[in-house]
Design a protein with these regions (language model features):
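STAS-like cytosolic regulatory interaction modules
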Residues: 1-63, 67-105
Length: 105
């Protein structure tokens, strides 16, 4: 259902490495069709620090939550998640708002 009159948000996940820091920029809808791409993109390059930038994400479902939790398990102490308001709300409802890897929206 199109409520805004425009095209639906297109998913993308891109990674850029700067020294020991990997920044993964995710945009659009993260769902069961795209969550694994986000996960694999975040693990593509070895890095001591990984920032998962979700500030341009417009939809985030249970598959996306699962992918982020798996990333936190794969990258203990190295993951930082920058959420959009929608993503933060979903993670809050899911009981994950107090995780050390999650920054405020």
């Amino acid at each position: 259902m199109d409520q805004g009159g425009g095209a639906s948000p297109v998913f993308s996940a891109s990674a850029e490495i700067d020294g020991d820091h990997l920044r993964v920029l995710v945009t659009g809808e993260v769902d069961m069709a795209t969550a694994d791409v986000m996960f694999q993109t975040a693990l593509r390059e070895p890095a001591e620090r990984v920032t998962l930038d979700l500030r341009a994400v417009t939809f985030f479902d249970s598959a996306a939550i699962h992918a982020v939790v798996r990333l936190a398990q794969h990258l203990p102490g190295a993951l930082t998640v920058l959420p959009s308001r929608q993503v933060h709300r979903v993670l809050d409802i899911s009981g994950l708002a107090d995780q050390a890897w999650l920054r405020p929206a």
